[in-house]
């Protein structure tokens, strides 16, 4: 059979694929072989020497041996067993077995399990303590060199999966050990706290601090007591068998009190899923699983360690009702009756459009569905929106124009396998850290090409093959110029255009102004570089374009998004693996909030409210008439409050009072509302203006689904009971609706999803049963459950099945005048999320990044006499901020960068204005200028020494195992067996 090999294993002949190693074949065939250092997500590391088998009569490491036709493999011979035991002996020389009192005795310790499986009763080489102390310096995990077996999993994960490139093994020492950067304490290194190392560690050497002293019944014993206990046990032990049996009993007992629950991350749009280990209300650790569809074993600092907010003392636990200038606690019944009374009163007096509703991109799909149903079906208004209006609506608009669906056209796996990745206006490694690891890995190990266009030199820019810095707001110019160049030079995919795309002629005409000369003049990118970009894109077999708020948050954001999609059509980069458009969604469920109808002009599944047949479908199921005119965007709502047309708002899980632009203007609007309801887990800045505050539950306290940036729908399961009297948002919305007479009878979020699936064609086959565990579905989903990981393989969702080249022109950015000479770019930092309402609750994160800072260029610092820690005031026409400076070459000239992670005097939206994308009302946050005033010259750097940005990474490929093999004290176990040696020294 083509592609198959005939293999003999332990005398049995079988067929196997040639695209695997011997160990993979053995594992797939359920043939047990020790493999302490091997991890499927890491590949062969070759450090442990326990996976040795006989291949054609020669002892070899099975993890790295490529399978060949005719191979004869023996896993049972005495020589194989001897070699494996020699490898295991060396591991036990480095690792002391005290399993019963070990926090890692939870059934997953590779050393414990391998000793048991190999039936090793005694080790030939006594354990020998290493001359190193534990490194406890990091807030989230610790390293115990004395227990480290030098398998290198952590190094492999850091170097080639996460690609932070912090960890190495110093093989030159007498007793090698893992080191961080140039051998500094963990907390002073370039470690980004992603947690990969502790996730893949096969034992207790690298472990989350949340586990220490908490996991076991006999753990947490102080060292003065523990050490004598271990020594006494060693003195009386009769063999490992009995000791391991006792530890297995203790491990089984732990299952009674340690709960492991699958959830989906509540932070960015990557959609990482993982198990949360808890004891009572304590979170012991987050444990990602290989089968997690978006992230596998990967996490970032927030997803792995940023959960302290769930148990914060600042959580809201009872409803609050305003009395004058303060709040008092109230019972649910009183709060709900007040809301129903006020909503009814205002609706009757001013009409349903005097009320407006904001749903949350932090909440579940089911909760977004209910919020828009409350607005439309109970109140009778289409005034409902979500925070995609602040970030992703322009990208959605651009994709609707050109390809018909407002979501990523493929999956993260497509991005990883692309020939070239084009990143525009996205600080991917900090905004979507796990997704960025897939690009960094492909770039490092596979030679994937990366082009970055951004005004700021972030990590992905530094790693890229080509980095260009266009003038702010000019991306559409170079995009159109490159498309024009490719078409005119015969480098467009003419067959794709002819067979699958409409509008070519009009589009080509629209490109006439976009010559290379014009593009150079307007963008600042020289013609030679523009041609280089065009040639790289044109020659690539497959291209993925990624973009984010650096594109969308401009007054021409929709048009630039359209231009990106146009360029992909010109080059035929839709409908095939490794290609397509990827507008990176910012929040965990900003995609889902829009998908499930929290938009003023769209019902769930993006069906238009103006479509009579669509409305009739919903009216039949909901049993009420629906409004037919599109409602207000959240941006318009603020203006309608000021004009007196909007009287009441219900805001759920959205910090509008900080994340909307021109927040002084927003706050003034809130004060004019007749009635304001805010539903949140904390008394947010927005909630401070409310008349009623309802205590909601975060994701760990409820069931539901999120939809990530790939259109991937995933289930989350309840980890904790709601704190105090807080409730899941879906229950609160239902109770509000029922006080208004709705009569809803949902018993579980699954009931809500079932209703949505009946109404919206793109969810037709979505059920909770199909989403069980780590299963997921990428919409559109057919009724039979078949989903769509890759869109547009056969047709585009337009009547004739063809995409559309949609002509767009450049809208120049807003001018602020010469007085405001500093351009204030803004965005995210890795450690914090948005205004920091969640992440500043984490002590460890706050220690590493306690405050925001203003990045300024060395040249601007020299011109103004600024140093690290200088306190400045930035003033725009709309407000001012006070913030400390940090000098860095990540920015240049009079470009500065102010992260959005502040809710006080440095909150970026004190500076931003109300101007917005002309097509979607998305605020033009990135078009902000200010003047600078020095308030205090001398100060302490806002970036602590322990921040990873001060580190010194050490890039290398993997663990450099050849350095181990070159050591004088190393002998390959296979050679030791040949020489008749009992162990390898």
Swiss-Prot record:
List ligand-binding residues for [4Fe-4S] cluster 3.
158, 191, 194, 197
The 4Fe-4S ferredoxin-type domain extends over: 139-170, 182-211
Q: Which Gene3D superfamilies match?
A: 2.40.40.20, 3.10.20.740, 3.30.70.20, 3.40.50.740, ADC-like domains, Dimethylsulfoxide Reductase, domain 2
Documented EC number(s): 1.-.-.-
Residue ranges constituting the 4Fe-4S Mo/W bis-MGD-type domain according to the UniProt record:
258-314
Q: Which UniProt keywords apply?
A: 2Fe-2S, 4Fe-4S, Iron, Iron-sulfur, Metal-binding, Molybdenum, Oxidoreductase, Repeat
Binding site residues for [4Fe-4S] cluster 2: 148, 151, 154, 201
Q: Which InterPro entries match?
A: 2Fe-2S_ferredoxin-like_sf, 2Fe-2S_ferredoxin-type, 4Fe4S_Fe-S-bd, 4Fe4S_Fe_S_CS, Asp_de-COase-like_dom_sf, Formate_Dh-H_N, Formate_DH_asu, MoPterin_dinucl-bd_dom
**Which top-level group of life is the source organism from?**
Bacteria
UniProt KW DNA repair keyword: no
Its GO CC terms are: membrane
Top enzyme category = oxidoreductase
Provide the binding site for [4Fe-4S] cluster 4: 265, 268, 272, 300
Q: Which cofactor does it need?
A: [2Fe-2S] cluster; [4Fe-4S] cluster; Mo-bis(molybdopterin guanine dinucleotide)
This protein is called: Probable oxidoreductase YjgC
Species of origin reads Bacillus subtilis (strain 168)
